[in-house]
Amino acid sequence: MLGSATIMSGGQAVSSLQNRVIFMVALICAGEAVYALPFHVTRFFRPTVLEVFGITATELGAAQGIYGIVAMIAYFPGGPLADRFPARKLLAFSLWSTAVGGLYMATFPGYVGSILVWGFFGVTTILLFWAALIRATRDWGGVYTQGRAYGVLDGGRGLMQAVMATIGAILLSLMLPDGVTPTIEDKEQALRLVIYFYTGMT
């Protein structure tokens, strides 16, 4: 009887560990994927973005500035929102909403549309997401290992960023013709595929 109880206890411990690992991996993937559309696309593919969107670097900076303003405001109600609603529901809604923004982004909306979509990303990635991510990570870490939890989260996000950027660069290069100067249509198709990739990851 004692042996059976020990085996059952050990099995429960393994199952609990597996669940914790899966949950943290999900947090890492979500925690980086949600910021891919507002940040990765312009960070790693800026020249193509400017040409395809038909905007200048200054106009792109203005759109990202709108993101910053909306995000700064969104931090304040984001905390109480995370305390009121389950973190998993907020994270899921944020990811889906950001993906919808990605579909609009893939239409290359120009300057005004860029202002709107980056402002929208400020709501979906901060108001709905950031505080919920922090809360879920804190709960995962418990009372004594919160620092370790945040370290694993940020380290994993860095790795996730590198993997996604590499795949995005490969997709872009595969879509552009070899040996000839790519046309604007070629660049549009290539960048759209990259945006769809990031949208799918979100």
Residue ranges and their predicted role:
Residues 150-173:
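Glycine-rich segments within core transmembrane alpha-helices of 12-TM secondary carriers
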Residues 96-110:
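C-terminal ends and interior cores of transmembrane alpha-helices
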Residues 113-128:
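Hydrophobic core of transmembrane alpha-helices in multi-pass small-molecule transporters
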Residues 192-202:
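Symmetry-related core transmembrane helices of the 12-TM Major Facilitator Superfamily/SLC fold
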